[in-house]
Amino acid sequence: MASHIICYIFCIIKLSCAHVCLMSFGSSYRVGVHITHEKVAACPRQNQRLYSCDSLRILYHYSCLTTRDLLYICDCSDFENIICLIRLLLNLDFVEVKLV
């Protein structure tokens, strides 16, 4: 992977496991996502579908990507939302996810 020096966006969001492909690296995960919509505002009174706002009032909509470089494991064994710390590299399609 090419190195990039660029600003980061830090946020905490709830991920619906049914729509997140995880690749395990110990306590962290590599997630391939495609961000289709980004909204920075107060949380809506009713959550949209399976996604919810966090305390930072950042709402993301995304879907899993496929790539020949990574083998994805879609883990929905516990059917629970995963609360993660997301570090988003603005010019990449991949984010690093650490469970908190």
Curated annotation (Swiss-Prot):
Please provide the record's keywords in A-Z order: Antimicrobial, Disulfide bond, Fungicide, Plant defense, Secreted, Signal
Where is it localised? Secreted
Can you list the disulfide-bonded cysteine pairs?
A: 21-84, 43-64, 53-76
Signal peptide start and end residues = 1-18
Q: What is its main location?
A: secreted
What is the top-level taxon of the source organism? Eukaryota
* GO CC terms in record: extracellular region
The Gene Ontology biological process annotation of the record reads: defense response to fungus; killing of cells of another organism
Q: So what family is this one in? A: Belongs to the DEFL family.
Protein's name according to its UniProt entry: Defensin-like protein 316
